[in-house]
């Protein structure tokens, strides 16, 4: 399925209109069923859908990890993801029903945030990873080079999992949380440890993005944008290093200063 469509538009520039073709991000609703029961519909970018499903179910505590999932069947034509699970968390299973998560998330996702997060995040973030400023600038440069769809459409969020030396996984999605869930799902299925890794994110570091980072077990998050006040406060409580405004040869460290040299 195409992740970008091409639309004829009228652009106003230099005092005149002209008809051009513009690249637009595809928006795709995916309904997840767990053991034949409808759980949620997520509006997403239609790629790496199995990664999204595994990452979402694990990060939201519906399952404990890939070991609880027997199979994931993605039916692209109907927008269905059918999951067969051998274990479902009974507490979080109460969220079953017709939940609809838009690409911008917000209140439509509130049932999946803060109510059960305390038991899902690692409040003892002690990742061994440390980064120098030169490492950060190099990683961000590589991240930007892998952001073709973002630059093409301006309508997606990018996220990456990286070590001090390289980007391991890079995923994009119209939903900022989805991009992180796709990374988490891939890492879980590959057996890749996230505790000694960092997250690179294309957008603002909100409290919800900070919680997602904590659920992944990463001790550092890097972004070209800034964190919110609540995100900084949560980062200090969870011992997560937040680095923002990474542009050119400058950056700001907002929390967890000891990991950046």
UniProtKB/Swiss-Prot annotation:
Originating species: Listeria monocytogenes serotype 4b (strain F2365)
Highest rank taxon of the organism: Bacteria
Gene3D superfamilies named in the record: 3.10.20.10, Cytidine Deaminase, domain 2 (3.40.140.10)
Function summary: Required for formate dehydrogenase (FDH) activity. Acts as a sulfur carrier protein that transfers sulfur from IscS to the molybdenum cofactor prior to its insertion into FDH.
One of the Pfam families matching this protein, by short name: FdhD-NarQ
Recorded GO CC terms: cytoplasm
Main location: cytoplasm
Protein name in UniProt: Sulfur carrier protein FdhD
PANTHER family xrefs: FORMATE DEHYDROGENASE, SULFUR CARRIER PROTEIN FDHD
Record-linked InterPro entries: Cytidine_deaminase-like, FdhD
Keywords carried by this UniProt record: Cytoplasm, Molybdenum cofactor biosynthesis
Gene: fdhD
Binding site for Mo-bis(molybdopterin guanine dinucleotide): 245-250
Similarity comment: family membership: Belongs to the FdhD family.
Subcellular compartments: Cytoplasm
UniProt record, GO biological process: Mo-molybdopterin cofactor biosynthetic process
GO MF terms, alphabetically ordered: sulfur carrier activity; sulfurtransferase activity
Catalytic site: 105 (cysteine persulfide intermediate)
